[in-house]
Design a protein with these regions (language model features):
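A compositional/biophysical signature of low hydrophobicity enriched in polar/charged and small residues
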Residues: 1-158
Length: 158
């Protein structure tokens, strides 16, 4: 069960994951131990999965983003497909989807040659019968945080 204080803590941490318990405590007018305990519980519940740095992929040299639609031969291969996707460093996201495909991957690579090499590898994964790629030309919104205002009506994430 999340209360308003938990939601405020999560909002602060989503804006800046390096915010200290002391800084959060000051902004919410609570004690440092109270904030630390709440963060610990949010982590134990799995609401906070991890803390990480958000990189600028273009400045890091990954200039090309693509969405790769996967058509799989049979659902027997899904587990191995997901395992391969999880092991592939170029795969940023992997989702099971409805429609003509079975999965969609969001991938980031250096250039078109790297994408071609990656697609060759993916097409050789067990069960993959076809891929279709769509290149991202421009990105106007990429969000890593959840809009916690929607939680004002639903406080239970269990």
């Amino acid at each position: 069960m999340l209360d308003n204080i938990d939601i405020e803590i999560l909002k602060i941490l989503q804006k800046n994951g390096r915010s200290s318990a002391s800084d959060i405590a000051k902004s919410l007018d609570l004690s440092v131990p109270a904030i630390s305990e709440r963060i610990k519980k949010l982590t134990e519940k799995g609401i906070i999965e991890r803390f990480s740095a958000i990189l600028n992929h273009k400045k890091a040299g990954l200039d090309l983003t693509a969405y790769v639609f996967i058509v799989s031969e049979h659902s027997d291969h899904y587990e191995k497909f997901v395992d391969n996707a999880n092991k592939c460093e170029a795969v940023m996201e992997c989702h099971s989807i409805t429609g003509s495909g079975s999965h969609i991957l969001k991938v980031r690579v250096k250039n078109s040659q790297a994408l071609e090499d990656l697609l060759y590898d993916i097409q050789n994964w067990p069960g993959v019968s076809r891929t279709q790629s769509n290149l991202v030309l421009s990105s106007y919104k990429e969000e890593t945080s959840i809009d916690l205002n929607i939680l004002s009506d639903m406080h239970d994430l269990d």
